[in-house]
Amino acid sequence: MLNVLILGVGQCGNRILDAVNKEAMGGGGASKIAKYCLKPKFPSRVETVAINTAINDLKELRYTTAKDRLHVPNLHGMGANRNVGKQAFMDNRDSIMGEIEKRGDFDLAFVLTSTSGGTGSSFSPLLINELKRQYPNITVVTVAILPFREEGSIYLQNAAFSMRELMELDADGIILADNQYMKRFSGDIASAYDKINSTIAQRLLFLIESLDSEMLSVTDLGDFKTVMNGGLRIGTMGYYQADGKNSSVKDAIENSLKPNNLLYPANVADDAARAMVIIQGSRELLDVDQITKEV
């Protein structure tokens, strides 16, 4: 069984993590009190921790239990100041890593974070360094969220510095999601947030399940790491679910790469150095030879 750690850092990371827990509890059918009476059903052994300096951001989480929330004392957040955020992380490094360490060993960690805010963009590079130091054999992948352009110059500047630091790390790759790009398919900003968070959560859970399941062609953590280590070590995720109307394998693959099914604007066919194609369905409908040909 795969041992997975999912860390949501800062407000953006917290909300995506909460969406992950919601999906693991049953998606749209999960009620507001689900966290008190239900346990998320993950495909692997998954531990989740929401980390934030703003206690009010942690309080608003609806599907993440209190034991999975870590408040780093610093009044009410970083106010988009990355320098203050870095100092806050260093001041509280031992308690943060202690909270993670008591949850056991892990094969794979996802760090969910905005690149533009204060806590997420400043904590995440330092946190990833500590994870690689404390768990030498762990695979660490960042799910990095680029800001809406309307958020302003400070947030765009933070994103530039944060991305540079993330790319310089000795980690295993970055999965990019662009809020501005995905807003095109979600309407206005207010309604886009929930849609974007749930979209990322669904794809992340699908990926985890695929890395820890019996398949016609084995796809495991080593394969995922090889793909993420290709090129610039930056990737995105596409997803498509057939509606049951005689959708072919070719159609499924092509649809998963269409702009409205990607988290980031990319010409995958022309620009990708490596790719992993995961197809889930009934065995009688999956022909390995056909899949190999289409890929």
Model-predicted segments: where are they?
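Tubulin/FtsZ superfamily GTPase core signature
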Residues: 1-295
